[in-house]
Amino acid sequence: MKKDLGVLQAVYPMPVLMVAAYDESEKVNVMNVAWGQICDMDKIILFIGEGKKTWLNIQASKAFTVALADKAHMDVADFFGIASGNKIDDKFERTGYHAVPSDHVHAPIIEEFPVVMECELLEFLHTDHVDGIVGKIVNVKADESVLNEKGKVEPAKLNALMFDQFQNGYYVTGEKVGQAWHAGAGLMKK
């Protein structure tokens, strides 16, 4: 029997995304975004409030990067979610992390995070209920340490963080339990 839990953000898991952009003076800012997802083969949508520093930076620079946070960098990833760039001027510098310019867009790549998408701004979405940023993914970079022998990102090596909205916890992904577009194929024959 199921129990009513009320209104909850009940999508699980959510990725822990590190969104980085330059401000008007080329200063790096990074934000932890749990509410984001792929919305087409080469597009990503991020649900970020319009007044956030990251929103303003992307509006000015027309580009951003989205990195996948991993277990090894959980504390800094969490800091990027609880510290506001509008209130803490040296937010990125406090971490001791390193940024390099993207080769493909005008945005920083945070070297410590192992997988990063380089994105051009496509549009801002404004509705009565949600604000979003849609970006075109122009390239993905990955540290060789998280790639398998076929050159693909290996989830078990990546140790990507997942956000649990039920208990506000971070978890790690990694165990493969089936093959997508194959596990249910037997039911197609019925």
Residue map of PLM features:
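Basic, polyanion-binding surface patches
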Residues: M1-K190
